[in-house]
């Protein structure tokens, strides 16, 4: 036994040193710029001869641990490598814990082009590194999106990618804002976003991922880890002269499972916050046009110049509340609820000269118009969606009410006081179910909508004129689609049934016009639409032929049966990873819009009457379009160009009768031909030499149409061209320049006259950062308007903004319209008339505000 104890003791003495010498070398590997952990990076310890002694792989959290034998490692080197990053190494010395930063690098594989410093691309996803495009003066993700090549942010906030409008706007794959993504772009801090993904050929239903149907384009914001699952946002408190205020609160809790956003805003500073509640995604906008829905008949909107920012002309008091929540109720299902309310009161003051080009003369009416438009809107919706692997189901219920009141006082060549009430109330239900059956798909969709549109107009001018309109409509649509997939081919049958039942009651009475108009009629139809489609898809080629056949039965105001036939061919070809072609061609007849038809004339404003009787003839159409796009992700170059043609011929003519102070519009049987051409192109490139981006855009519309004015048929042409070039450069850390140059041409021509306007615009923003937390921005805008028969008009605006950041608080002072410009002139063309308008502008204002970020 003594020998056994001695043997055990002897062995412990031998092996204990080896156990004691096991030493752990650990650490964390992260990505430069974003701070995100790098997964599956290879970590090695090498000796002086570069021989690998120990190796390991980082975890999802970017962590690693290597166990050594305890030898002297001070002269050894630790090395880290990972695809898409530059290798990193450092001497070990006496360290045992390491924080290693990997710098992204560019590499190329088949169909994969990556420049991870700024832009990466894989298959259908293009990713933008937010830190690669942001600067010290940027606050929101919208500020950074404008600097990303290939992404265009329009004046109204809508986002497009290389010429294509986005279908959805997501945060961590969740559609929290339901198309109202101005809330996200104008309020979410860019510091919370690691990268922006643009995903093409995207299907919102997982079961459709491998289908041959054409997907959409979505934008997805990827959150940094620090932003997930916690409340973040900003609060703003501002006041200034003359008697202006601006108060805002935005708070959001964002993650991949549960999301909430709360927006509360109020101001009278001219800042447009109403647009944050506008639906901007292509999918939602197209959904609004699926059914033939009635629109407001009375003209209640206020005129504003399209070239100016709304802050120049808005003289409004606005309140806005928007609350949205997405709650995950199971592994695949969510419940999305939303409610928003807006209350806006805007004052418009304009001087207007309308010229009517008649056969033997030109009739001009000059007036001053002062109007107060009040708008209130309430919308509430709830959506249940189950996006599983075996099926997709969604059901949405939505209620909305819109109340509008416009009081307008007109003086000049004719004088009156008019008050318009125009409301819309609706309840809408949309249901969708998709079920894969083997390689095939069955889709069922249903939509039911009921709405009422009460409208009133009262005009006082040497007597009183009253117009009352009440409309109701019920729309029901059921759609059934079955798709057979056969390797490269797919064949589908789409069957749709639509029922529309509507009623209109209108009554016009006047003291000074010895006429009354009354109508109480129903406009109903039942339609069956069958559309077989054949799709071919192989590698980068996709071709689809649709042959829809529509049968309509009308009763009520007009009784008839009609058949419409509009075949369409779409072809797209991904020629290479950089070039893509697309063409579209359709030819046939389409059903007329009847839910906005009425026989008795309706007074739409204080000087216009309109009637829209149903003409029992359909319109023959030809449409064609061709587009080409180029993307070079490595060199950050994006370009696209497209041209479209349309030709239409129907058996109805638009008629216009100008008499004294009134204008009458209607329709009558006849032959009418219209032609149009659209040209669109854009180019954007990131240039590292200037630390910025250059861009160029061109948009042109060339249209020909015919109108029957005062009994004479007149062919006329309207042309519109908009071109612009821009430069954004972060010249130094302390200096950023943004310059835009634009040139627009609008013209109207017919046999007896030709007139046009030209507009040259320049906008320059210069931001100075003398110290890290102080930003001084000087903004200047120049508008040069050139008119055919009037002197040119030059207008210069200037704004100054100073911002100082103290920890998480911005102290901001802004001086708007420094030169105190009073008015702005603009001309627009409508059929055979032109409107020369002088708009009253907001005067000079000063606003001091505190913005706290959390």
Model-derived segments and spans:
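A short, solvent-exposed loop/turn motif at the edges and junctions
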Residues: 48-51, 71-90
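Short, acidic Ser/Thr/Gly-rich low-complexity loop/linker segments typical of extracellular
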Residues: 49-63
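Face-selective signature of the C-terminal outer-membrane beta-barrel domain
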Residues: 326-344, 372-557, 567, 574, ...
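Conserved C-terminal beta-signal and adjacent last beta-strands/turns
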Residues: 724-743, 751, 755-854
């Amino acid at each position: 036994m003594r020998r056994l104890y001695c043997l055990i003791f002897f062995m412990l003495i031998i092996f204990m040193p080896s156990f004691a010498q096991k030493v752990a070398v650990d650490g964390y590997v992260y990505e430069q710029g974003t701070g995100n952990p790098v997964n599956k990076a290879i970590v090695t310890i090498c000796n002086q001869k570069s021989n690998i002694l120990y190796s390991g792989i980082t975890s999802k959290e970017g962590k690693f641990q290597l166990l050594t034998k305890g030898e002297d490692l001070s002269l050894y080197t630790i090395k880290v490598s990972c695809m898409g990053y530059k290798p990193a190494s450092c001497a070990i010395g006496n360290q045992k814990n390491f924080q290693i930063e990997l710098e992204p690098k560019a590499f190329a594989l088949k169909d994969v082009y990556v420049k991870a410093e700024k832009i990466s691309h894989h298959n259908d996803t293009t990713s933008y590194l937010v830190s690669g495009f942001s600067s010290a003066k940027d606050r929101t993700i919208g500020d950074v999106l404008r600097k990303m090549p290939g992404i265009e942010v329009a004046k109204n906030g809508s986002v497009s990618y290389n010429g294509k409008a986005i279908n959805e706007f997501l945060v961590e794959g969740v559609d929290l804002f339901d198309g109202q993504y101005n809330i996200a772009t104008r309020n979410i801090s860019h510091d919370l976003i690691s990268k922006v993904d643009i995903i093409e050929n995207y299907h919102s239903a997982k079961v459709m991922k491998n289908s041959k149907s054409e997907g959409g384009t979505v934008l997805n914001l990827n959150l940094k880890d620090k932003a997930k699952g916690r409340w973040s946002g900003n609060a703003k408190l501002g006041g200034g002269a003359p008697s202006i205020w601006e108060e805002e609160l935005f708070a959001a809790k964002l993650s991949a499972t549960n999301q909430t956003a709360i927006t509360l805003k109020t101001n009278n500073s001219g800042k447009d916050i109403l647009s944050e509640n506008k639906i901007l995604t292509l999918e939602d906008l197209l959904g609004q046009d699926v059914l033939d829905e009635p629109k407001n008949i009375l003209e209640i909107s206020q005129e504003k110049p399209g070239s100016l920012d709304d802050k120049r002309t808005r003289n409004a008091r606005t309140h806005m509340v928007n609350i949205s929540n997405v709650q995950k109720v199971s592994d695949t299902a969510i419940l999305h609820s939303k409610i928003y309310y807006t209350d806006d009161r805007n004052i418009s003051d304009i001087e207007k000269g309308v010229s009517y080009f008649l056969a033997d003369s030109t009739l001009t009416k000059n007036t001053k118009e002062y109007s107060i438009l009040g708008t209130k809107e309430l919308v509430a919706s709830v959506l249940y969606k189950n996006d599983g692997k075996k099926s997709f189901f969604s059901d949405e219920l939505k209620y909305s009410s819109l109340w509008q009141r416009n009081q307008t006082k007109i003086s000049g060549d004719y004088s009156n006081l008019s008050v318009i009430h125009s409301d819309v109330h609706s309840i809408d239900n949309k249901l969708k179910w998709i079920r894969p059956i083997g390689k095939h798909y069955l889709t069922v969709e249903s939509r039911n909508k009921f709405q009422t549109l009460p409208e009133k107009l009262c005009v006082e001018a040497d007597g009183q004129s009253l117009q009352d309109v009440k409309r109701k409509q019920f729309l029901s649509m059921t759609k059934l689609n079955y798709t057979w997939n056969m390797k490269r081919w797919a064949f589908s049958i789409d069957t749709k049934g639509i029922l529309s039942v509507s009623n209109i009651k209108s009554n016009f009475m006047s003291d000074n016009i010895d006429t009354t108009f009354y109508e109480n009629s129903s406009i109903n139809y039942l339609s069956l639409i069958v559309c077989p489609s054949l799709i071919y898809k192989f590698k980068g080629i996709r071709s689809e032929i649709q042959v829809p056949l529509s049968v309509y039965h009308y009763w009520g105001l007009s009784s008839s049966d009609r058949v419409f036939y509009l075949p369409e061919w779409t072809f797209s070809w991904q020629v290479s990873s950089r070039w893509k072609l697309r063409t579209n061609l359709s030819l046939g007849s389409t059903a007329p819009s009847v839910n906005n038809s009425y026989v008795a004339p309706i007074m739409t404003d204080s000087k216009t009457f309109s009637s829209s009787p149903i003409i029992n003839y359909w319109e023959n159409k030809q449409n064609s379009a061709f587009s080409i796009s180029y993307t070079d992700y490595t060199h950050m170059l994006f370009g696209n160009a497209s041209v479209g043609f349309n030709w239409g011929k129907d058996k109805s003519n638009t008629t216009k009768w100008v008499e004294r102070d009134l204008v009458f519009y209607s329709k009558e049987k006849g032959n009418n031909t219209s032609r149009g051409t659209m040209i669109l192109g854009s180019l954007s490139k990131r240039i590292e030499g200037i630390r910025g981006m250059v861009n160029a855009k061109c948009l042109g519309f060339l249209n020909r149409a015919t109108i029957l004015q005062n009994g004479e048929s007149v062919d006329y042409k309207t042309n519109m061209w908009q071109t612009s070039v821009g430069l954004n450069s972060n010249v130094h850390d302390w200096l950023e320049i943004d310059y835009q140059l634009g040139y627009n041409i609008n013209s109207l021509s017919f046999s007896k006259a030709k007139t046009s306007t030209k507009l040259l615009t320049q906008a320059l923003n210069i931001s100075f950062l003398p110290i890290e937390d102080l930003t001084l921005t000087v903004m200047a805008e120049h508008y040069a308007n050139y008119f055919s028969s009037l002197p040119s008009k030059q207008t210069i605006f200037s704004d100054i903004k100073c911002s100082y950041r103290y920890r998480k608080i911005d102290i901001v002072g802004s001086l708007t319209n420094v030169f105190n410009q009073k008015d702005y002139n603009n001309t627009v063309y409508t059929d055979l008339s032109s409107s020369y308008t002088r708009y009253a502008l907001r005067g000079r204002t000063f606003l001091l505000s505190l913005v706290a970020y959390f």
